[in-house]
From Swiss-Prot:
CDD domains recorded: AdoMet_MTases
Keyword terms of this UniProt record: Methyltransferase, RNA-binding, S-adenosyl-L-methionine, Transferase, tRNA processing, tRNA-binding
Binding site for S-adenosyl-L-methionine: 36, 61, 78, 120-121
Catalytic reactions of this protein: guanosine(26) in tRNA + 2 S-adenosyl-L-methionine = N(2)-dimethylguanosine(26) in tRNA + 2 S-adenosyl-L-homocysteine + 2 H(+)
Taxonomic superkingdom: Archaea
Protein name in the entry: tRNA (guanine(26)-N(2))-dimethyltransferase
Origin species: Pyrococcus abyssi (strain GE5 / Orsay)
Task performed by this protein: Dimethylates a single guanine residue at position 26 of a number of tRNAs using S-adenosyl-L-methionine as donor of the methyl groups.
Database matches in Pfam families: TRM
Family: Belongs to the class I-like SAM-binding methyltransferase superfamily. Trm1 family.
Gene3D superfamilies, alphabetized: N2,N2-dimethylguanosine tRNA methyltransferase, C-terminal domain, Vaccinia Virus protein VP39
Molecular function per GO: tRNA (guanine(26)-N2)-dimethyltransferase activity; tRNA binding
EC number(s) recorded for this UniProt protein: 2.1.1.216
Domain Trm1 methyltransferase: 4-375
């Protein structure tokens, strides 16, 4: 296996040389550097002490956590023997000391403790029951096969980071796959990125409730063909009940672009999409702190990270949005400038903002009829 050195953030790692990242014996995707940047920023805000990157491959995420965050004990795990051996090399490339190895587990103790583990992620998380303050699940595809075990491995007031890269099911191109994996009916079309994000958060809420756990969404977003959520667990059956009250369904009229949301454990009408999470997709206070801290860190994609966090900070936190191009096409209305629409909605007393889910979308608490009137009359 021929290796090349790569720099990302403060880390330097060896990765397999290959024509395509998908051909490499150990997976490293440089396009996910921004995903890792946002996780680094969050860990600098929340400061979890013991963290796990459950599906580590080269170890880049865990090594960056060790180098760039206050985390004190960092676990990196992969079922691949090639990945395990490469992670050990990469740890020693970034940290002084010797690895103490036994039974598929290598430990380096210095100012921080780094653990490189060779095992199935579910088996490791089952072994370390209620051990981690933060677990990051970043699989190739869906995280669902790891969710149950992660909810039992993280502390009862811990934090889960979850990435889903299977956009086709969550965006409604493969609805049966979404129903199998996420137990929800997806919505195809211009709203799919937000609906997919809310399906992902919603299934975490349902799984957590089994263990008398509620959830608080620290941040959930869509970027570069992946869905991402950071979720803090809240201990107690009552917290689980409260989280389930934030589940519901979406009704969407394809001919008009009008949508309705319904908070309910079961839908009251046919043709419902969901269940989805209808609660907040961010903690405003934490996102503001993340934006501030991101400007002080040496991130791999700093400009992109700051830009994304600024958009997320300013985004109105209400379910769904109106796509100006989609509505214009349906209603045969000429598309208007988004800032013009937002300003007019605000002048009428409604809240409104851009949304990161779509460059042509507007989030607002204005009714559909008001929005259409503004869309058609804005000058």
């Amino acid at each position: 296996m021929e290796l090349v050195e790569v720099l990302e953030g403060k880390a330097k790692i060896l990765t397999p040389k290959a024509e395509s990242i998908y051909d490499a014996p150990v997976f490293y995707n440089p396009r996910m550097a921004l995903n890792r940047d946002i996780a680094v920023v969050l860990l600098n805000v929340l400061k979890p002490r013991i963290v796990l990157d459950a599906l580590s491959a080269t170890g880049i995420r865990g090594i960056r956590f060790a180098l760039e965050t206050p985390a004190e004990e960092i676990w990196m795990n992969d079922i691949s023997e090639d990945a395990y051996n490469l992670m050990k090399k990469n740890v020693l490339l970034n940290f002084k000391g010797e690895l103490e190895e036994s039974n598929g587990r290598a430990v380096l103790k210095s100012e921080k403790t780094l653990v490189v583990n060779h095992d199935d992620a579910n088996r490791l998380m089952a072994e370390k029951h209620r051990y981690f303050h933060f677990i990051d699940l970043d699989p190739f595809g869906s995280p669902m096969e790891f969710l149950d075990t992660a909810l039992r491995s993280v502390k009862r007031k811990g934090i889960l980071g979850i990435t889903a890269t299977d956009g086709a099911p969550l965006c409604g191109a493969h609805p049966k796959a979404c129903m199998r994996k996420y137990l929800a009916v997806p919505l195809r079309g211009e709203l799919c990125h937000e609906v997919g994000t809310r399906i992902l958060v919603g299934v975490v809420a349902r799984y957590a409730a089994k263990y008398d756990l509620g959830i608080e969404v620290i941040l959930a977003y869509y970027k570069d063909h992946y869905f991402r959520a950071f979720i803090k667990l809240k201990d107690g059956a009552r917290k689980g009940d409260e989280s389930l009250e934030n589940l519901g369904y979406i009704y969407f009229d394809e001919s008009t672009g009008k949508f309705e949301v319904e908070r309910s454990f079961l839908p009251s009408k046919p043709n419902a999409y969901g269940p989805v999470w209808l609660g907040p997709l961010k903690s405003q206070e934490i996102v503001e702190e993340m934006l501030e801290i991101s400007q002080q860190l040496s991130l791999a994609r700093k400009k992109q990270a700051v830009k994304l966090l600024k958009i997320l900070k300013d985004e109105l936190d209400v379910p769904l949005f109106y796509d100006t191009h989609g509505l214009g096409r349906r209603l045969k209305i000429e598309a208007r400038k988004i800032e013009e629409i937002i300003n007019e909605l605000r002048s009428l007393g409604y809240r409104a903002s851009r949304t990161h889910f779509s460059p042509t979308g507007v989030k607002t608490d204005a009714p559909y009829e008001v929005f259409v009137n503004v869309l058609s009359s804005a000058k």
